Amino acid sequence: MTLTVPCLFGLESLVADEMRRLNLKDVRVENGRVHCDGTLADIARLNISLRCGARVLMELGSFPARDFEALFQGVYALPWEDFIPRDGEFPVKGYSLNSQLHSVPACQAIVKKASARRLGEKYGLETLPESGSRYQIQFSIIKDVATLYLDTSGEGLYKRGYRARNMGAPLRETLAAALVTLSRYRGKDPFCDPFCGSGTIPIEAALIAKNRAPGLDRSFAAQKWKNMDSKLWLEAADEAMDKEFHGQYDIWGGDIDPAAVELAKHNAALAGVDDCIRFETADAGKFHRDSEYGQLVTNPPYGERLLEKKEAEELYRTFGAALRDLPPKWRVLVLSSHTEFERCFGRSADKKRKLYNGMIKCDVFMYGK
């Protein structure tokens, strides 16, 4: 079967690398999604182990759909009864892009009607109870080609289960993990985040250092599916836990807000990595480190939601000045949507990478080799 992992734009290559490390076959990249060939066992492995992907979708079929009749017949032809039991709940959601069928609510209604008719005929029911487990149907219609999926994840994979509550504008865990991955941090050198907020970046760094799978402390929609043996999930969890490392790590998170620091400590405890991270109330404008090597990965306020633009610019200037004394072998990654970040920071980036934080277009400014 084909499995599809949607992701934030700009993270496709990182997700593809993750899938290859899990020995998935025929990994293929498109804008905003990565495909592979897989099995039911791979559904469990991907959900438990992926750090940067948004969710895991099982592809059911693809066909041309230039009008509602073609959409109905294409959906009706799919073997829904092979996946959805007679009492299964099957809500529908999706999107359309550059297609004749552009009304998403109308397409949702057609997909629901066609799948319900097929299931009703197969089970001999005029009305389907939908009282059982949830089988979320997703569709995409791109350039008049419809693709139908079942969502195996349920809640997005960014919901690791450790964030008790948010401070201000939180960074999604999947994006935080991507930033840490881009820094090439592996747990050997010091790791710092001077704008740690609720602790997401240091926590994801600790999970990466320990090689702890991010999905071990949560549940997934497909765990309740009748065609997914619970043994597959236990085996995937055992495989992931067998890969964990146990060592000493120098991971630090600082924030000027004491309430944020306390929340970060609480979240780290929920994630089981509080023994790996030091959190402190600290001013990023006074950041200093003497160690020869290290990684600094951070997401300062952008001036769009948390601070006014001028305040953000002054913050970047102060922070940039503090980092001028950082030893030259440190690697620094800063996520920002500010178009004048480099000017304010006082240094041009050695490398930049475009990606999105939610709906905000950002750059990752990368310094160091």
Locations of the language-model features?
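SAM-dependent Rossmann-like transferase core, predominantly class I methyltransferases
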Residues: L148-R184
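Accessory substrate-recognition/RNA-binding modules or partner subunits associated with SAM-dependent
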Residues: T2-Y135, T152-G154, Y158, R165, ...
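Short SAM/SAH-binding signature in class I
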Residues: Y293-N299
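C-terminal edge-of-domain segments
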Residues: I137-S153, F365
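Short amphipathic alpha-helix with an adjacent loop that forms part of the alpha/beta core around
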Residues: E81-F83, K286-E292
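Conserved S-adenosyl-L-methionine
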Residues: L171-R289, R305, K309-E313
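Long protein-protein interaction modules used by eukaryotic assembly/scaffold proteins
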Residues: L333-V334, Y367-K369
